[in-house]
């Protein structure tokens, strides 16, 4: 039975963007299968006492920008600290990823997730806009308009709710969040620890 890592994703998270490619590379290296779970982090914050960015204290908002600058420079990754279309709801993108996963598999959804996050944090695109999402999906080789339409179907909405409920039950409170062997790891800055857990399973 393949080793699995559950990946709770908020597509609008800059830290998910910074960690996404490294997560996929580590999973490939260690033969770990990623279970992608795009979720409603508004509901998760409500359940866990978290605050959306706009409601956080100014000190926390300022330090967040400093940390993002440090990490983007350290990793050598382009990142616009204050993109034009942020804050933005990640729900439309999350549901598109679920629709992609159902239609084309997890690898396709993971690849599209990377494209969506880069679109927000590097390319100044509005990932809350259906036409933008359709164009990104089409650029990835899919029928973007059909996937956006599918993202509002009952099956996708049901999965979105299920993933969110699972996250709350698993004590998730931030994104990105990774789970392996029932143990949670919050944030891309925990990827070293996560990779150690991957290696222990070999």
Please describe what each predicted stretch is:
Residues 4-6, 12-32, 111, 115-202:
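C-terminal cap of thioredoxin/glutaredoxin-like
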Residues 11, 17-120:
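Structural alpha/beta surface segment adjacent to cysteine/selenocysteine redox centers
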């Amino acid at each position: 039975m393949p080793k699995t890592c559950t990946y709770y994703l908020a597509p609008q998270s800059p830290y998910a963007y910074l960690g996404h490619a490294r997560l996929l590379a580590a999973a490939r290296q260690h033969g770990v299968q990623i279970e992608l779970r795009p979720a409603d982090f508004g509901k998760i914050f409500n359940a866990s006492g978290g605050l959306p960015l706009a409601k956080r204290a100014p000190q926390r908002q300022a330090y967040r920008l400093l940390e993002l600058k440090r990490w983007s420079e350290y990793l050598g990754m382009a990142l616009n600290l204050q993109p034009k279309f942020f804050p933005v709801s990640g729900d439309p993108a999350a549901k598109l990823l679920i629709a992609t996963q159902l239609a084309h598999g997890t690898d396709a959804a993971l690849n599209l997730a990377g494209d969506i996050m880069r679109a927000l944090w590097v390319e100044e695109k509005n990932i809350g806009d259906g036409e933008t999402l359709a164009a990104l999906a089409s650029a990835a080789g899919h029928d973007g308009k059909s996937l956006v339409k599918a993202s509002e179907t009952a099956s996708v909405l049901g999965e979105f709710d299920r993933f969110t409920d699972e996250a709350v039950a698993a004590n998730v409170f931030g994104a990105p969040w990774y789970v392996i062997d029932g143990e949670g790891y919050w944030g891309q800055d925990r990827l070293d620890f996560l990779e150690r857990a991957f290696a222990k399973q070999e």
